[in-house]
């Protein structure tokens, strides 16, 4: 993924990109995959060259090698030595059951537990699941007015900071046809009251919409972000529409 991505970007952007990892492993993979890129081993960001620089992680035998790479990237970002970092797909076993995935891990490192947002971004539309990588039978108990308020307020703030405009946010209900607004439904107890409060905060939010009929062209042109109640509710239609043309941004 790294070599393929670097091969496709322009020369000016290549100068701003470097890899964090074990130089020998990366060099070996480069050769095996037959990519014609020139690598340069560095031990400090001051050693940048015109080649593809690899910030060398010496001890790749450590069990936490991948986490070490992530932690270094995170530390550089916090110190504002880099603008950001991109991680390749990560085997969740490295978290040893302590975290559901990268979103939660980064949240913990930033003292923002339970406030993390996993936004799957495409320039045409982004989606955000209120709950991330949890079992379906745990979803209902993880929905609350407070969580909806926190997540959408944070989403609105960070989206504006990243893309320099105020997003139009659509929110889906949890149940089929929003449970026809049954008084004991999550829509009536949590989602609708949260949306009323958010509108009073001047956040451009609408819903709840029934998930089964939301994802068609007319609706997609109206909104920048769709917030669903659980992972597959928004990621399944999103990946079908955009054919994996997206990136996962942790907010």
How would you describe each model-predicted region?
Residues 1-251:
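Anion-binding alpha/beta catalytic cores of soluble intermediary-metabolism enzymes, centered on
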